[in-house]
Design a protein with these regions (language model features):
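A conserved ligand/cofactor-binding region detector
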Residues: 2-455
Length: 455
C-alpha cells in the first residue's frame, strides 16, 4: 500500500505508509538493494540496518517537510550548541516517536526476526557521557515534540568516550568505536564544508570608508564537514535536525613527501587535523591536551556560526533582523567562545562596526550554567589564546574593557568589584579568561526563546 505525494516544492515520489505490510516490504527491499544480501545469509546486524533504513524512510519525508515549512514561514530558529549530545539509541526512539513500534515488531516477526534482538544490535551514539549531554538530547527531543524550530550543533566524535574494563586488577580504557559499522541514521553532507582558522596573526588595515578593520592571516585551516541526523518529536509531526561536524584536513595527502619515501609525513597534516573530532574530552593534563580541547570547542562553534549566518543571509539582506530570526543557546561554557567568533564574523567578514555587531550579538545568545563550583567554571590561559586564537583575544579584551567601564560608572571606586567581575582573571599573576563571565556579559535572558513558540 502506497500513497502518492503531490506536495508543492518537494520531489514527487511514492510515500511509504506506516502499516506492518508496508514496513515489511520496505525492509525486504532494503535487504536487497541497500544491504545486497539474501535473507538466509543475512546477519542480525544486516536485519537491524534494513529495519533502520525502512524506519528512516518514514522519518525523511517529515524531516524534509519540516525544513521546508521553516523556510516558507521564515521561522525564528533556535540553535542549540553543545559539546555533548547523549542521544542513546535511535532505533527504538524513532519507532516510539513515529508510533510504529508494534507495526515494526509485526513486520520483523513475519520475516522471522525478533525486534528486541534487533534493537540490541545498535551501538549507543558516543556523543556524550553524562548529564550535560543527556540534557542536550532531551532538549532536542522536547523541542521537536513541541513543534519548535530547532537545530542542534555539535561534534561527530569518531570514538567518543572510552569503554572501561578491569584487567589484572587495574582499570583500563578501550576506544568506543561506535562508528565501526557506520551509522544508518546520519546523512553525510560533503558539500557543507567550512574552513576553521587557527594560529596566525592579526593585521589592521584601513577600509574604503576610513574605518580600521582587521585581517586574521597566516592561519592554519581545518575543514568542518557536516553530518545531519533527523530528530523526530513525539507523534512525528515535526522532525528537526542535529548537525554534527567532522574535522577534515585542508591538505589531505602530500605527494611530494610520499614520493620521497616519507610515508608518515605524507599524511601527517591530515591525521593531525582530523584528531579534532576523534575523542570527546581529550586528556587535558598536558599543554597539548589543553590546546586540543580549546581547538575542539572553537572548531564546532566556528563551523556552526558560519552555517547559521549562511542560512540567515539566504533569505535576509539586512542584519537588523538577526536577533528576530536567530536564537543561539550555549549549553554550559564550552561553546561560549562563540560570542567572540560571532563578533569576528560580523566585523571582519561582514564589516559591521563594533556597536552594531555587539548589539546583534548580545541579543542573539542565551547561556545555561550547570554548576557554581569554581573548578567546573571553565577558564583558559591568556597565553593559549594569544597563540591559538589571537583575533578572539583582542575582541575579548575589548568586550571586557567596555563592560568594566560600565561597572565603574555604576559602582565608582569599588576596585574589588571590578576584579571579581572582570572577564580576565589575574589571580596570582596567572592571567586567564573566565568563559562563564564572558557568556553572562553577552547573553540575553532566556525569555528571548518565547518568540519561537507558536501561538
Amino acid at each position: 500500500m502506497i500513497m502518492k505525494k503531490k506536495q508543492p516544492g518537494l520531489p514527487q515520489y511514492d510515500s511509504p505508509l506506516m502499516d506492518a505490510d508496508s514496513i515489511r516490504n520496505s525492509l525486504s527491499a532494503h535487504m536487497t538493494f541497500s544491504i545486497s544480501k539474501f535473507p538466509f545469509s543475512a546477519t542480525t546486524r544486516d536485519w537491524y540496518e534494513s529495519a533502520a533504513f525502512a524506519i528512516r524512510d518514514r522519518l525523511v519525508e517529515r524531516w524534509m517537510e519540516t525544513m521546508q515549512a521553516y523556510y516558507r514561514e521564515d521561522s525564528k530558529r533556535i540553535y542549540y550548541l553543545s559539546l555533548e549530545f547523549l542521544v542513546g539509541r535511535t532505533f527504538s526512539n524513532a519507532m516510539l516517536n513515529l508510533n510504529i513500534h508494534e507495526e515494526c515488531k509485526a513486520a520483523l516477526y513475519e520475516l522471522g526476526q525478533d525486534i528486541e534482538t534487533i534493537s540490541d544490535i545498535e551501538f549507543d551514539a558516543a556523543l556524550g557521557n553524562g548529564g550535560l549531554g543527556r540534557l542536550a538530547a532531551c532538549f532536542l527531543d522536547s523541542m521537536a515534540s513541541l513543534n519548535l524550530p530547532c537545530y542542534g550543533y555539535g561534534i561527530r566524535y569518531e570514538y567518543g568516550m572510552f569503554h572501561q574494563a578491569i584487567e589484572d586488577g587495574m582499570q583500563v580504557e578501550h576506544p568506543d568505536n561506535w562508528l565501526r559499522y557506520g551509522n544508518p541514521w546520519e546523512f553525510p553532507r560533503p558539500e557543507v564544508l567550512y574552513p576553521v582558522k587557527l594560529y596566525g596573526k592579526v593585521v589592521g588595515y584601513k577600509h574604503e570608508d576610513g574605518t580600521t578593520h582587521h585581517h586574521w592571516v597566516d592561519t592554519e585551516d581545518i575543514m568542518a564537514m557536516a553530518y545531519d541526523t533527523p530528530v523526530p518529536g513525539y507523534g512525528g509531526k515535526t522532525v528537526n535536525n542535529m548537525r554534527l561536524w567532522s574535522a577534515k584536513s585542508s591538505r589531505d595527502f602530500d605527494l611530494r613527501y610520499f614520493n620521497q619515501g616519507n610515508y608518515i609525513q605524507a599524511v601527517a597534516d591530515k591525521n593531525e587535523s582530523e584528531n579534532l573530532s576523534k575523542v570527546l574530552y581529550p586528556d587535558d593534563s598536558t599543554e597539548m591536551g589543553k590546546e586540543l580541547r580549546l581547538k575542539q570547542q572553537y572548531f564546532f562553534v566556528s563551523a556552526s556560526l558560519q552555517d547559521i549566518l549562511f542560512r540567515y543571509k539566504k533569505h535576509h539582506t539586512s542584519w537588523d533582523e538577526l536577533p528576530d530570526k536567530v536564537a543561539i543557546q550555549l549549553n554550559d561554557t564550552h561553546p561560549s567562545i562563540g560570542i567572540a567568533e560571532l563578533m569576528r564574523l560580523l566585523m571582519d567578514t561582514h564589516h559591521l562596526p563594533w556597536e552594531r555587531a555587539w548589539s546583534l550579538t548580545s541579543k542573539t545568545f542565551s547561556y545555561t550554567n550547570h554548576t557554581l563550583m569554581p573548578e567546573a567554571l571553565e577558564t583558559w590561559p591568556v597565553s593559549l589564546f594569544e597563540n591559538l586564537l589571537p583575533r578572539h583575544l583582542e575582541i575579548i579584551y575589548e568586550i571586557n574593557h567596555r563592560f568594566l567601564r560600565d561597572v565603574m560608572h555604576h559602582f565608582p571606586g569599588d576596585s574589588d568589584l571590578l576584579r571579581r567581575m572582570s572577564i580576565i582573571s589575574e589571580d596570582g599573576g596567572d592571567r586567564r579568561i573566565r568563559m562563564a563571565h564572558l557568556a553572562i556579559v553577552a547573553a540575553t535572558p532566556l525569555t528571548a526563546w518565547r518568540s519561537c513558540i507558536p501561538n
